[in-house]
Amino acid sequence: MSIEDFVQAAQLFLASASQREFISIIGSAALALVSLSTAVLTYMSNRVLTAQVIDTRDQLMTKEIEVVRVKAATEESQKALDRIRRELDEREANIRKQEQNRRVLLQILKQSDEDVWIRHEPLLKPRDHDTRIARRRPIVMLVANNKGGVGKSAVTLNMAAFFDKNQLVQGKKRLLLDLDYQGTSSYVLTKAVDILERQSRAQMLMSEGASELDLFSARIGLNPVLPTTELVPSFYELARHEDRLLMEWLLGESGDDLRYRLSRVLHADIVADQYDLVLIDAPPRLTTGTINGLCASTHLLVPTSFTGVSAEPVANFLAMARAVKDKLNPNLKMIGVVETLTPTGSVSQAAKDARALARLTVERALQTYFPDASIFARDVPRMNAMIDDGLASQDDPKVEAIFEQLCTEIRGKLT
């Protein structure tokens, strides 16, 4: 082979090698491009899938949130529904209770005063009630009669005047508690010391939870007229309070026994330390105040005139007082009946006979219900001075002498 042939053959070979290499490079590039495309496609597919997953997740979260909202709304609606049901149940229960209360009140209205006040159950007497009444500290005297217009307030007022000067225990005070909603004693005493306001405070001592602090807030000093005596006044508004207290008690809305509220106040140790005598002026009927007075009293005094229209109510009152003693206050002592409004001038034989018959009616009632009690020897005559001035014993020597005799007799029975 010649050199030219060799060179030509070599060039052909090189040319052929470059072409193969180029083809190889092109092939490699093509494979790389395919791989890149595949990677790009894979990436893009993953992006699309990721976006779809995210979108799907967002949709699911949106649905879950909506479900939660619906559930919350449902629960709130259920709560509201339950609340409405409870309110309806409460209203229904209240209606039933009111209907039951109405039936109870209708039954009570058919009963006598004695059934309402004395036989009412349950009896929630304070544990130490009987012991405190028996110790007679202080003496608590109820001046009472179911008949009005018999001089009851005049007797109470002039007794207060006597004991203001003649203390049972030196150094202690007296208290006049006016439980008569007409407020006669309160009017006379407040007028005497220039107090013009007519305000009832007696109901404070019969409210649920009443204590000696209520007494100290309610009392009024009577200096200089009765310097050692204090007053708890009453007026017509007392009657409204009494009726409300009675209804609450009968319907079971109070947590204690209404009948013993005054007793807890008057027989507290601190009250016994301050007062030796409490005089209670009671109304002429069996009220919340009257029954509280009977349950709180150590002694009972009954003023009455000896007439046909007055004697029979006295017999009924003594029967009721005996029932109170037997059921509610066994240590209550009946000290006697004082005749009031006795005629001072000449009277007809018919009037004398009527008076004697009335006296006999009272004596028989005493013998039946309180055989240890009697009619006081000293009577209280009908006098203009006593009609015009409730505290006549302060100004009229004759009236003063009458009450000195009567109160001395009474004092001898305060044991």
What do these predicted ranges mean?
Residues 212-226, 230-280, 285-286:
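Cytosolic-facing regulatory segments adjacent to core modules
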Residues 171-176, 181-235, 367:
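Phosphate-binding loop that captures ATP/GTP phosphates
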Residues 1-85:
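Membrane-aqueous junction of the first/signal-anchor transmembrane helix
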